[in-house]
């Protein structure tokens, strides 16, 4: 099973130390309620070999390599174990000669977001809904002091720990399997990311307030979410599914989203990027057995979802507490 004690020790002397009042008990309770496959996935992480990487690149990719490459047989065994953790949603990863070609080219999103951010060097960062942690490693590559991701999905935790193991067990990033609604308000993070989460929330303004409660005064929110065309009063509430997803509740226009952020008290709210999701960014690969974007769009008109809504378009909004 995954040991969180190194994380507790890591934050004990930082301004995240107040979290230790609640977090260890929460994670003990979490361990008692884990999914039936969690033990199997955690065991796969244990099975992965301890490989010493001579070169790690987190600045331009998530990549590890050694002077002495793995043999064909060693690579085959490593691929076998990593594929037991499918589906791999967010990536890509290049680990000891193995290319984990994930469904999402999350590096595309990072390239859109990064130029607009306050420098991440020496910052304490929270990544809400972090998935398997691809962007967390890129934050480490930008010099962040501490990166904490939260995501309750157990498979993502095990994927993250597998990648960590193949990055020389780097402890600068940590994934905690909780949702933001389970976090006490710490007001301790210099930057808070919420990317691809807001439209899954039944109460989006509550989510925005929860994000604000984790920021230091003046800290930066990085919000990336689905949007639709329209004015300040435009919000799409899908009747049933959106792009075959059942758990999509509110998709605002950019002006409406800016209004929401100002409503809950954020300042200096600005939209820095709007981009449609392309078939190059989200697609089927050998590391994903499920459907992908092409299956979610109208086959005759890719500007619409299969339900007839505007096809996925994502905006990046920055704001300060």
From Swiss-Prot:
Gene Ontology biological-process annotations: tRNA wobble uridine modification
Enzyme Commission no: 2.5.1.-
Catalysis: reaction(s): carboxy-S-adenosyl-L-methionine + 5-hydroxyuridine(34) in tRNA = 5-carboxymethoxyuridine(34) in tRNA + S-adenosyl-L-homocysteine + H(+)
Keywords: Transferase, tRNA processing
Residues that, per the record, bind carboxy-S-adenosyl-L-methionine: 90, 104, 109, 129, 151-153, 180-181, 195, 199, 314
InterPro entries documented for this protein: CmoB, Mo5U34_MeTrfas-like, SAM-dependent_MTases_sf
Gene Ontology molecular function terms on file: methyltransferase activity; transferase activity, transferring alkyl or aryl (other than methyl) groups
Family note: Belongs to the class I-like SAM-binding methyltransferase superfamily. CmoB family.
Subunit structure: Homotetramer.
Entry function: Catalyzes carboxymethyl transfer from carboxy-S-adenosyl-L-methionine (Cx-SAM) to 5-hydroxyuridine (ho5U) to form 5-carboxymethoxyuridine (cmo5U) at position 34 in tRNAs.
Protein name: tRNA U34 carboxymethyltransferase
Source organism of this protein record: Pasteurella multocida (strain Pm70)
Gene name of this polypeptide: cmoB
